[in-house]
């Protein structure tokens, strides 16, 4: 889960550049959201898994999204399992509108960040990427 949409693409690019990771497939549901409004970036990657006697490549799915996208996806997932709701199309329409509002919020937050970055001394792209990779390493080791 990332703070901003551009972080998603930077992270996906950084993962794809890893020597021990092979990208099998990518789906960009941010540029082409699902019909219900779902937005996220999916990658199927092959990663080495180390066993006591061998190393085996395994396919795993990585889903990268913003905090706002994750909020929507989590609630939509819970709500879609509620059965026997009258006027379900109304619910679907409302969820889709919420997804559009969240996408708009993501864009606005990105603009706020850019404004702030332009007014202060910024870390280099290399420093930003290193910090993102450090966070990934911490998250995978927890």
Where are these regions (language model features)?
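Long beta-strand-rich cores associated with HINT superfamily self-processing modules
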Residues: 1-109
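Intrinsically disordered, low-complexity acidic/polar and Pro/Ser/Thr-rich regulatory regions
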Residues: 108-142
């Amino acid at each position: 889960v990332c703070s901003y949409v551009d972080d998603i693409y930077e992270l996906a690019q950084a993962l794809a550049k890893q020597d021990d990771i092979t990208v099998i497939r990518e789906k960009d549901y941010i540029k082409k959201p699902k019909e219900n409004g779902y937005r996220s970036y999916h990658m199927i990657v092959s990663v080495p898994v180390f066993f006591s006697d061998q190393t085996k490549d395994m396919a795993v799915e990585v889903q990268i999204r913003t905090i706002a996208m994750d909020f929507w996806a989590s609630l939509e997932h819970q709500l879609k399992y509620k059965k026997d709701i009258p006027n379900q199309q109304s619910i679907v329409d409302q969820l889709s509108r919420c997804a559009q509002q969240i996408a708009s919020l993501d864009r606005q937050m990105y603009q706020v960040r850019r404004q702030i970055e332009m007014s202060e001394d910024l870390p280099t792209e290399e420093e930003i990427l290193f910090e993102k990779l450090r966070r990934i390493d911490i998250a995978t080791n927890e």
